[in-house]
């Protein structure tokens, strides 16, 4: 026992402990946030939600866009605002890449109470998501939800019926755990991170919206006929030359989405996974309407099914659309969310010119 007490009193023990506690406290107050890796999950969710709130006084929207990377890349907020300016309407977006419904819900909880004028929410859906739901909290989702109000996150992970374990709770609670991979990357590659941070401070985003898609790369740069052909021609390890105008990042993005397209289920069967998705969607939509009422608005939610490359026609099942409509009516019997289906709106001989990869539009597709 004496040896144990002596060890506790030894400066070799408590000085490192105090340093670790001090670092954790600093991270809890957001001191590390400016140093997060560019476009990481945690950096994206913080940057997007904080930016729209910072610009709220000069740009207070009437319409709010909610969704994932499909909406983030596929909708031009400047063009939408230009088109709606004659009606006196303003559009803002809190679409965040890689988000499950729980992250979209937390983004709504953080931002919508400040947007008192929002009367319409456009929720951009991906047609396949009800069939690929998650019961556990994966690392990207943990990284994003840990950036929100902790008290809201703790209750939300149970409301959304995740299978929560102790490690999940530790990850959400301790920033030193949540940021450990990011810190490791910073230590291994400090020069690149410093350059990114310098650019961020030097080039300030003065626009009210966080992002505008500027990608000019397109699928049609690669002679792709079908999914198996796509995997073969865009495999980063195939050694084939990269077409002019493309780069290794674009090639890999196409490859990754071809792998996804090759593995995602192509049926429209309803099971526990699909039911859970729509139960979670109900929580999100109920929250939007509740906050709207608190803001003095009767918010109308409009569902939009995003377009995909026509190379993945097998995702477009009439039966899936019927499941969507049926489930949207089940979760809101008195006021079901209308569903606008734009899956095939860019089909045609030049379809490949509009897509960066199989799922995301490029700048040309966004403008169309």
Describe the role of every protein-language-model region.
Residues 192-193, 287-318:
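Active-site segments of SGNH/GDSL-like serine hydrolases
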Residues 20-90, 103-110:
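Membrane/wall-proximal cationic-aromatic binding patches
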Residues 124-128, 304-308, 342-345:
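Short loop/turn segments at strand-loop or loop-helix junctions that form parts
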Residues 313-368:
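C-terminal regions of proteins
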Residues 66, 70-160:
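Membrane-embedded segments
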Residues 248-266, 306-325:
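Active-site His/acidic residue clusters
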Residues 1-20:
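N-terminal Sec-pathway targeting helices
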Residues 140-293:
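Secreted/periplasmic serine-hydrolase-like ester/acetyl group-modifying domain
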């Amino acid at each position: 026992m004496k040896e144990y007490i002596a060890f506790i009193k030894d400066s070799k023990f408590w000085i490192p402990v105090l340093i670790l506690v001090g670092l954790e406290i600093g991270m809890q107050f957001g001191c590390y946030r400016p140093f997060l890796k560019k476009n990481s999950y945690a950096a994206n969710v913080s940057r997007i939600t904080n930016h729209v709130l910072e610009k709220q006084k000069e740009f207070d929207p009437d319409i709010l866009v909610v969704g994932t990377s499909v909406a983030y890349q596929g909708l031009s907020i400047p063009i939408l605002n230009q088109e709606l300016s004659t009606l006196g309407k303003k559009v803002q977006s809190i679409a965040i890449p890689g988000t499950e419904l729980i992250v979209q819900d937390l983004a709504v909880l953080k931002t919508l109470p400040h947007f008192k004028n929002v009367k319409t929410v456009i929720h951009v859906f991906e047609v396949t998501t009800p069939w690929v739901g998650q019961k556990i909290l994966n690392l990207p989702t943990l990284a994003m939800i840990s950036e929100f109000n902790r008290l809201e996150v703790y209750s939300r992970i149970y409301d959304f019926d995740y299978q929560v374990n102790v490690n999940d709770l530790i990850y959400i609670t301790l920033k030193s755990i949540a940021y450990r991979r990011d810190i490791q990357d910073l230590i291994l590659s400090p020069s690149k991170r410093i350059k990114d941070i310098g650019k961020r401070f030097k080039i300030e985003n003065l626009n009210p919206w966080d992002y505008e898609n500027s990608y000019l790369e397109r699928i049609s740069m690669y002679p792709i006929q079908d999914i198996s052909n796509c995997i073969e021609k865009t495999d980063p390890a195939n050694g084939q030359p990269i077409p002019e105008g493309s780069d290794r990042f674009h090639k890999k993005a196409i490859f990754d989405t071809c792998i996804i397209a090759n593995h995602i289920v192509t049926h429209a069967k309803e099971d526990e996974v699909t039911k859970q998705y729509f139960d979670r969607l109900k929580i999100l939509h109920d929250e939007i309407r509740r906050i709207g009422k608190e803001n003095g608005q009767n918010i109308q939610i409009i569902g939009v099914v995003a377009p995909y490359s026509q190379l993945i026609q097998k995702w477009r099942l009439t039966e899936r659309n019927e499941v969507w409509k049926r489930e949207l009516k089940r979760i809101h019997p008195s006021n079901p969310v209308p569903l606008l289906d734009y899956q095939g709106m860019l089909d045609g001989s030049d379809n490949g010119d509009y897509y960066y990869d199989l799922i995301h539009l490029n700048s040309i597709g966004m403008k169309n």
